Amino acid sequence: TVLLVQPNAYPKVIQIGSALEDLQHAVDGDIEAVYPFEDSVGVICNEEGKLRGLPANRALRDEGGHIYDVIAGSFLVVGLGEEDFCSLSAEQIDKFEALFHQPEAFVRMGHSITAVPIPDSVLQARDEHRDAPKLTHSSHDDR
């Protein structure tokens, strides 16, 4: 049980295999594991996400709340076992779902990047538009 964090979406708790191919599929490419937190968790992201132009997803911040990196593309938050990745505990799921809950948009201002939370209303409107039935136009007259 891990957390999948996709761009412009709320995190999802998912079940995933621990094979390399499973992790690569989840992040759409070769994986890179980073360990930005004191907790026994890792972040698995696409190694070439920025180079491939994957959408900016979430910011990583230091203790002072300053952005030091932005993850591009989907990523996983996974538990750390003695020798490999493992499931997150319920407490870890709660903590990191809260940390990464709100999708972010990014704005470059001079030499820095600012993360702006995407309001729930914008996400809901997008989802409603995406889920709305599509109207089709007939190419002939039905009279």
Give the role of each language-model region.
Residues 1-129:
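N-terminal nucleophile
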